[in-house]
Amino acid sequence: MNDLSLVAQVSLFHNKRAFDQLVCKYQSPLRRFFMNLTLGDAQLCDDLAQETFIKAYTHITSFRGGAAFSTWLFRIGYRVFFDYKRSLKLTDDIATVSSKSLYQGGSTSGLASPHSTSSDPSLSIDLYRAMQILKEEERTCITLQVIEGFPIDKIATITGLPAGTVKSHLSRGKKQLAEYLKKNGYGKS
């Protein structure tokens, strides 16, 4: 069955097996997308992918078919990732305020420490290190085009950015990656 048929089965008949087929088809590409956005944090990847599939299942009736199911799913994944990043920023802001109040003699009881976003030090894949130098938008666009194979118009739909902006992010990101990799022994001098 194609994606539209599976979506129809899920939407109309709440067919969980049809949704399982969609999950099986898109789980690896979605995890790969998150793996690159999180710079190799496998646990976070799994959590973000699970959250994406939960949101996709609960909102599947809002899928209109104007774009491919994969584009719609990756758009949800993109939003899930940035919701996560936004929550980290809030946690970082709370930690900053709480550390200031601690410095000034206040209490921080009940506040959790912020989640570390640094990559695993044992990670030896140079591409993740190279991806760290990119801005979030550049990393997202590079991941969607180079690794996932999405064309510029689909990347624009997923990210909500104009196609020209996507092209700019891709150009800058590829240039920075090439320079980084060249400096670190890849390619010709």
Give residue ranges: language-model regions.
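N-terminal module of bacterial RNA polymerase sigma factors
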Residues: 1-29, 179, 186-189
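Internal acidic/polar
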Residues: 3-4, 91-124
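Sigma70-family region 2
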Residues: 12, 40, 53-68, 87-89
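Amphipathic, Lys/Arg- and hydrophobic-enriched alpha-helical face
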Residues: 23-42, 59, 131, 183
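Structural recognition of an alpha-helix C-terminal capping motif at a helix-to-coil junction
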Residues: 47-54, 67-79
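Arg/Lys-rich amphipathic alpha helix in sigma70-family domain 2
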Residues: 62-64, 75-96
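Helix-turn-helix DNA-binding module
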Residues: 129-140, 144, 148-165
